[in-house]
């Protein structure tokens, strides 16, 4: 047996022995009739205590004689004869307990407390004080075991070192990793901030179907499921767009939705098969209005959630305080590939030659617009580090966007980039029912030619447009990628509580 295998076997034996001992302790609690009490109530969390009392001097705390009740997980314990110090962790952070034998009911210290294990969940009552080193602590007069942990904490509280284990057992990651807990607290604040921002501007939050007969609103491969009662194949939605615009037709002029989308595609540091999007639609507005709204949203969130418009990310610092850069797609190609002749981007054969010269395989179904977009993706996207809006997307790759009045080959559309990745996509909506019907037909033809990400024909949506969609602009923002930026996270798995994982064999 190799040394590594032997070490692994020893760890399994140690774990089994420890779990056996813990189960025996639980059995003893069951015999006493109180294995999982549910009558303990706390009145403060650790962060509340630190916020209110950290600044007070020891003498002031003693004079105030403040009794508190806390509960949480025992993370560390130092037993020093007749007294011990415990680190208790709750949702707000950590607080130190001072546990003295003579200050507890008879038998609690030796017969109960000293037999408890790290990871157990405790309830404690006592008086606030400060230690000689100035640490806010609770001098316990009551201590109870609320939940017996049958498994030990990971690596004796040194944290999870295995990235895979962090994602598969997120509960252990959250117990042992402050950074991970803070990431998801920040995510929650971002979502709350978005909702506050939108409602303040007159938007109504709505919910639209997650299972759809016709998947639409984006170019992507859908997941397929089956409805037994209807004997009908259905699709997990790839986007809520077409349903949200139906609501605008119905008279809800400002709507937004924050929810999951599903795309049956690859997994990477930036892609998860299910992900969170925020989509909004705003009647009597165009894409330029949404550029302003997007810039304001990110600046507001940075200031409100992080307290600054200077957001660090790896070696970069994103500046949300200054005006965001704006480039057309062709301008971006020229900026980051200066040798490009702009005239070549207006001709199919010339653009194809440019694409092939930089290693792009041009599919037979591609038109000029798709080729130019692929060139942009290859030469420019990775360089868009600071917040940047890219405009003038080709109509070929924008089947739901309104054509530009001056040049019908492009659309009134933008994508928003930060850190070399797309974060948002918005455009003036196509509200010409006949044009939309033709673009759906073009997508059907592309699908027949082998493009499995092309859209389906949605007859009911065309019918809705025939009733009249006001001039409208729409925007979609990837929440997971936004959270990555605001938390300095470099893989999407770090900002999704339970990311998609291959099953353990």
Curated annotation (Swiss-Prot):
Compartment(s): Cytoplasm
Annotated binding of Mg(2+) 1, by residue: 415, 422
Protein name: Lysine--tRNA ligase
Documented EC number(s): 6.1.1.6
GO cellular component: cytosol
Subunit relationships: Homodimer.
Species for this entry: Salmonella paratyphi C (strain RKS4594)
Domain of life the protein comes from: Bacteria
